[in-house]
């Protein structure tokens, strides 16, 4: 029997606010344990939560970017459960009346086709604390710094049918929240976490199977591997006549497997009820319009503009716009020097610069070569001061911190030889020293032109303009 996976994702995005969702405590990452938790975060008696308006604004911003509806009011509810890192014994979340409803996000599959993934809802909630075990000598500690940090939980429709589609959706969502500035979505810091709901059904059937939930997967690669394992696990059970248990599972990256954590809870297990300490949130059309007017250019809008304005291929555009920082770097280079061809800038950013960054595990914002320096290099390639190979030499030297292109060219004597008289002298010597190859070329072996050009490049230590040399050879021969 052929089985069809049915996958829905719940993504927890930490919102980019200076303070927590219901208190004035800071949200900065990496502080000493329990130095950023106030009485409200700890749920001490007599304290009352106050909603952070910026969190509401960021949630609305996200909703508008995915063409969702923003209801005129939403309600906070208490989600009741016990866990050591939940000091109040309940989590303030949203249940029946979320702040964002019925949106969608288009993803591009590996074959270039586009698929629309529905977004059921996105709701605001507070994060819990975090357990830690190192250095506790048989005990577990609790760090409440994260407690009360604002989260936007984004729930997709069960429209995803493969691990590859799940990763494509997550990458599109990750890019979007960073583009619009609602989150830095740093996965290493837990600012972008994913729960995967997955079931199997016979292909062609509409009824869903029993689902399992895989909690807190924090990398694209692990999401893909967890889904692939879970599909195979459920398939094996069903084909052997067994039944799937509705449960919460954990992905073990070391063993590359999912393991059962607990039986999956239903909504009634959490005993949701409206939080009596928080009034309903009323969101008027004026507020929505104000947020809409501040929306930045969205990823798909930027891709369309790059393709039209810069005449770039879909491949180049996709690489340049995956991260907002790369797109900004590219446009900064072109603004600094309008004589640089966009294709030249794209080739260097997507090629040599990307390779160097990957090799050194750096992001574009950590690049030793800033946009001004790269522009200085590309200017000298565009005006034929440097050949492509010499440009790579300058790039490597620039990466080492020796300054801009002109400084490096002057210091290392890397200026390209374009003087026709000087080049013709070297060409004459090459022709004189290689009579056999000259005869073969004149007999119809046109590919030998590359040999002649190579000899000149060798003689000039790469400083000759290869195109100019090619043309001069053809005239001579």
Swiss-Prot record:
EC class (word): ligase
Q: What reaction is this protein's catalytic activity?
A: L-glutamyl-tRNA(Gln) + L-glutamine + ATP + H2O = L-glutaminyl-tRNA(Gln) + L-glutamate + ADP + phosphate + H(+); L-aspartyl-tRNA(Asn) + L-glutamine + ATP + H2O = L-asparaginyl-tRNA(Asn) + L-glutamate + ADP + phosphate + 2 H(+)
**Mind listing the UniProt keywords for this protein, alphabetically?**
ATP-binding, Ligase, Nucleotide-binding, Protein biosynthesis
The record, for SUPFAM superfamilies, names: GatB/YqeY motif (SSF89095), Glutamine synthetase/guanido kinase (SSF55931)
Q: Does the keyword Protein biosynthesis apply?
A: yes
Which Pfam family would be a valid example here? GatB_Yqey
* GO molecular function list: asparaginyl-tRNA synthase (glutamine-hydrolyzing) activity; ATP binding; glutaminyl-tRNA synthase (glutamine-hydrolyzing) activity
Q: What Gene3D superfamilies would the database entry show?
A: 1.10.10.410, GatB domain, N-terminal subdomain
Superkingdom of the source species: Bacteria
Might you give the EC number(s) for this enzyme? 6.3.5.-
Alphabetical list of InterPro entries matching this protein: Asn/Gln-tRNA_amidoTrfase_suB/E, Asn/Gln-tRNA_Trfase_suB/E_cat, Asn/Gln_amidotransferase, Asn/Gln_tRNA_amidoTrase-B-like, GatB, GatB_C_1, GatB_Yqey_C_2, Gln-tRNA_amidoTrfase_suB_CS
Q: Name one GO biological process term.
A: translation
Q: List the disulfide bonds.
A: none
Q: What does this protein do?
A: Allows the formation of correctly charged Asn-tRNA(Asn) or Gln-tRNA(Gln) through the transamidation of misacylated Asp-tRNA(Asn) or Glu-tRNA(Gln) in organisms which lack either or both of asparaginyl-tRNA or glutaminyl-tRNA synthetases. The reaction takes place in the presence of glutamine and ATP through an activated phospho-Asp-tRNA(Asn) or phospho-Glu-tRNA(Gln).
Family designation: Belongs to the GatB/GatE family. GatB subfamily.
Checking NCBIfam families in the record gives:
gatB, PRK05477.1-2, PRK05477.1-4, PRK05477.1-5
Subunit annotation: Heterotrimer of A, B and C subunits.
Q: What is this protein called?
A: Aspartyl/glutamyl-tRNA(Asn/Gln) amidotransferase subunit B
Q: Which organism is it from?
A: Coxiella burnetii (strain CbuG_Q212)
